[in-house]
Amino acid sequence: MKHFKEFIQWCCEPQRLFVLFIVVLAIPNVALFFTEQQMTLWARICNVILPVSVYWLIMTLGHKPGKTIWILFPFVFFAAFQLVLLYLFGRSIIAVDMFLNLTTTNSGEALELLDNLLPAVIGVFVVYIPALVLGGFSWARGNQLEYSFIRSQRKYALAGIVAGALLTVICYATQRDYQVKIEMYPANVCYNLVLAAERAGETAGYAETSRDFTFNASAAHDENSREVYVLVIGETARACNFGLYGYERNTTPLLDKMEGVVTFTDVLTQSNTTHKSVPMLLSAASAEDYDCLYRQKGIITAFKEAGFHTTFFSNQLPNHSFIDFLGMEADDWKFIKKDAPKGANISDDELLFLVEKELKAGHQKLFIVLHAYGSHFNYKERYPESMSVFKPDNLTDAKYENKEYLMNAYDNTIRYTDGFLASLITLLQKTNSFSAMLYTSDHGEDIFDDNRKLFLHASPVPSYYQLHVPFLIWLSKTYREKNVEVHEAILQNREKPVAGNASVFHTMLNLAGVQTPYRADSLSVANRQYLIRPRYYLNDHNLPKSLDKIGLKKEDIEQFRRNNLVFP
C-alpha cells in the first residue's frame, strides 16, 4: 500500500501531469497526420503544431494541471471518440452523422457494436481514464505548478502558436478550399457538433415546418381496380452479394425463379447512413435537394392524398427521427420491436403477418411501406439457425481473421431476405390485384473486403461496398398486361445508372399512377422519360458531391469498373 501511494504521488507531480495531459490530448492529431493522406503535408503538419500548441497554452493558464484537464474534459471525450472511429474506419474525423448516430442508434445496436470494438474501447480507457483519475487526485491534493515553469512553458506554447498560425496562412494561400473549421482537429469536430445540434433542432421542428404542405395528389388509374403497391426498404444489403447480381453463391434462389422480377444493375445509394438514406427513400428529398425534407411531407402522404389506404410497418425501433415522422403519416403504422421483450430478436418475417392482415382487410387502394432489419450487424442474429446455409458462421467478433465467418453469416442474411421478398410477392400474387413491389436497401456494408480491412458502414468516407445497393421491381401479371408501357420502360432502364434515393419516390408514384406537381418522370425508372444524371453523394455537411470528390480510393474505382458501374 505504501508503494502504491508513493507511485500515485510520483505520477501526480504537477510537471509530469502537465506533460502527460498535453500528450494524451495530442494523440488524435498525431494519428490524423498519418491517416489523412488526402490533405497536403503543410495542412497535416499544421494540424499537429497549432492545436497542440493551443492545448499547451491552455495548460499554462492555471496553476493546477489536474483542474485544467477536467475543464478540458469535452476535448478528452473527443479524443477518445476520435481514436475509436479511427480504429473502426481507418481515417477521417468525427462527422456530424456520428454525433447524430449517438442519438438515433438504439441501445441494442450500440451494445452489439461496442462488444466487437473491445480493443479500441480498452485502448482509450487505458489512455484517458488514468489521465483523468490522476488529474482528479492532483486537483484534490491541491498540487500546483511553479510560476517559473508556467512562464517558460507559456513561451514555448506561444512560439508554437505563431508557427502554427504561419502554417495556416500558407495553407489558405496554397489551397483554394482550405478552411480551419473543416480541416483542423479539433476545430472541425466542434463545428460538426454545432451542425449536429442545429440539425437535431430542425428535425424536432419537422411537424411545424411541414404542417401546411400538400402534394395536391390525385389518382390516374381506374378507381374500380384493386391496387396494391409495396415499398420495401432493406437494411445494410449490398448488391454484390446477391445471386441476382452475378454473385458466385446462390443467395437468391427464390427470386431467381420469380416471374416479373426486374433487377437494376447500376444503383447507388446517396448516403451510407440509415438516418439520412431512409428519409430520402420515403420522400422527394435527394442529395441534390436534401433540405426539402424539412419542408415537405413524405411519399405516404402523397398516396393518402390520392385515395390510398396507407400503412407503415418497421422492424426497427423508433428513435424520434425523420423515419418515424414520415412513417407515422400513414393511416396505420407499427414498430414491431417497440413492444417486444427487451433483447428479443424479431425476424423480418413478422412483417409478413401484418401485410397479410392488411391484404385481407380488402382495401381497394392500398400502399404498404416495410422497413426491414435485413442484414444489419450482428449478422448471425438476423436469421434462424434453419437458414444457416453458408457455414461456418458462428464467430461474430469484428476481426479480419473472422472474415470467412462474417461473410458466411452475411450471405445467410441475404438468402433470408430472398425468402422474405419471395414470400411477400406470393402474398401479392394471391390477391389477383393490380400490384407492384419495389425493394432497395438504404446502404451497403464493408466486410473486410480488401487490404484496407474496412468494416461496417456509415464511415465518413464511403466505399464501393457501401454504395452499390440492390434495386428490384416486381410487377404482377395483371399489371404487366394492363400497363405494357411501364413494363417496357422498366426493362429499358434496368442497366442505366440510377440514384436510388432520388428515384424511389418518383418511381413509386409512377407505378401507382399518382399524379402530383412534385412527381418528376425524368427520375422514374418506370418511365421512358427517365434521364441519366450526374451521380452525387450527400456528404456529412448535407452537400451534394460528385463521386470523384468524396474520397473513393483506387480499390473502390476498380470495383466500379469491374461491375460495369458508371463512374463518376
Outline where the language-model segments fall.
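Membrane-interface soluble catalytic domains
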Residues: 8-20, 64-68, 301, 318, ...
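Transmembrane and membrane-interface helices of multi-pass
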Residues: 1-185
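Histidine-centered active-site microenvironments of extracellular/periplasmic hydrolases
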Residues: 246-250, 433-434, 440-485
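Active-site rim elements
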Residues: 42, 179-180, 287-290, 341-342, ...
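Flexible internal linker/loop segments at domain or repeat junctions
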Residues: 386-403, 479-489
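Metal-dependent active-site segment of extracytoplasmic phospho-/sulfohydrolases and closely related
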Residues: 230-231, 413-456, 505-509
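A long, amphipathic alpha-helix that forms part
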Residues: 55-56, 353-356, 394-437
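Active-site-proximal alpha/beta segments of enzymes that process anionic O-linked groups
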Residues: 160-231, 236-397, 500-501, 506-531
